[in-house]
Amino acid sequence: MPNFAGTWKMRSSENFDELLKALGVNAMLRKVAVAAASKPHVEIRQDGDQFYIKTSTTVRTTEINFKVGEGFEEETVDGRKCRSLPTWENENKIHCTQTLLEGDGPKTYWTRELANDELILTFGADDVVCTRIYVRE
């Protein structure tokens, strides 16, 4: 069982602005979001398949609690409520599909993977993928 637990700081980010654009976020809000999310702090607690993930930025803090294999409610990157279903894609990677509770929008998902002491987080909106790499603090 991989150990995702710990505090993580972002080392690199690719395509975050493009992801927000694909989600329909306007230019001014994208600029604010990109600046605010440039140094997120992530805390993960794990007990087997049970996860608690807290992500803090200068403008927003999100917290999710879930068990791999069980659906839960959260918000997409742009703040829309969704039903999410996390599953183990492989022994070190969780893949989570998201279904909007209301309205239409791109097909979204996230993954979290441990590789070489790094946490690789991806967000997807249709065919646009944002990759963020974190290292332990």
Swiss-Prot record:
Cellular component per GO, a single term: nucleus
Chain positions recorded as all-trans-retinoate binding sites: R132, I133, Y134
Record bears the keyword Cytoplasm: yes
Highest taxon, organism lineage: Eukaryota
Entry-linked InterPro entries: Calycin, Fatty_acid-bd, ILBP, Lipocln_cytosolic_FA-bd_dom
Keyword terms: Cytoplasm, Retinol-binding, Transport, Vitamin A
The keyword Transport is annotated on this UniProt entry: yes
Compartment(s) of residence: Cytoplasm
Any coiled-coil regions, as ranges: none
GO molecular function, one term: retinoic acid binding
Cysteines engaged in disulfide bonds, as pairs: none
One GO term (biological process): fatty acid transport
Domain comment quoted from the record: Forms a beta-barrel structure that accommodates hydrophobic ligands in its interior.
Family affiliation: Belongs to the calycin superfamily. Fatty-acid binding protein (FABP) family.
Record function comment: Cytosolic CRABPs may regulate the access of retinoic acid to the nuclear retinoic acid receptors.
Protein name per Swiss-Prot or TrEMBL: Cellular retinoic acid-binding protein 1
Organism, as annotated: Bos taurus
Origin organism lineage: Eukaryota, Metazoa, Chordata, Craniata, Vertebrata
